[in-house]
Amino acid sequence: ADFKLEHGEIEKAFSIYNEALQVIPNNPLIYNEMARYYLSDHEEEKAFNLYGKILADPSYKASYKIDILRKFSRLAKVENRIHAQTKKFMGIASKAHPYNPQLNNTFAEFLFEENSFVMSASYYKVVVDLRPNNYRAWQQLVLCYYNSNDYEKMIQSSEDALELFPTLPQMYFYNGMGLIQKKEYEKSIEVLEEGNDLVLSSDKGLKAQFLSSLGDAYHALKDHIRSDEYFDLSLEVEPENYYVLNNYAYYLSERNTSLEKAKKMSKLSNSLKPEEASFQDTYGWILYQLGEFDDALNWLKKSEINGGNNSGVINEHLGDLYQKLGNSKMAKTYWEKAFEIGDASDELKIKLNK
């Protein structure tokens, strides 16, 4: 039947396949050949029906099923209509082989790529429980928790991974980031400094991340001397890291110190990543602190247009600027909007009650 199918004798091939199915019913190998033909002939409903039977059959090797699922994953990237069916197939296969690490990993990767981080984490958790030495699965599990804002599990899973991989610095970084999110700054500094010592000098990207995260942690503790030192070190390693340039510049502007340095860094971050609302806000706020109000208004309005209208901080900055320009009505409008959004400063209520 396979020979005849390859040589275009479709009817004869399917006649033989059906005869074979009378002898060995529901044989997944036969179904697979038939399904492949249906898919190539654009008879998707027939193909999907057979693939569903194959993937649900526990007797069919998981490795063969993974090949099928990866084929559908590739198709799903170029054909949106295939995506839902692929996800359904993944679920069918994982139920048939709940303790197969490779199959669970395949489903976890698919879910991660579609940003279904909570569901992806559940499958990566199965993988690391079955194969604790799979470092990449640990990394992905931690990133799932980070992307779903589950910092408790992010911290716990990175700690579990560190027991298995104590010399690999990346997991120290994840653990430190989780601790920063939980506002456990002293502990995060301990972890980040330990991990930083393990980073190879050739890995500039990771080294810069460790140093800037230490800068963030010390900033949160209001240890500005150490914070500035770490940001400077980070920029020595990676001078054009626009996130570090922006964050460092903004922290300086908040403290109303080293504003010319902040202005230079912020200008560079905006040239490296144009149209970024938070970066434009930083530059506008630095100009505000320098008393360059007209230019500040130009940059803060750019920030508003590029998405900053949904930020309490940016609306509060616009309110502060309009107040400086003598337009109390506009100032109050922006302050009220900032209050509604809810991520503005603690002083906002005082401004509104004046």
What are these regions (language model features)?
Residues A1-G326, E336-K354:
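Alpha-solenoid helical repeat scaffolds
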Residues K329:
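Residues that scaffold, gate, or flank divalent-cation-dependent active/transport sites
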Residues K332:
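C-terminal interaction modules of eukaryotic adaptor/scaffold proteins
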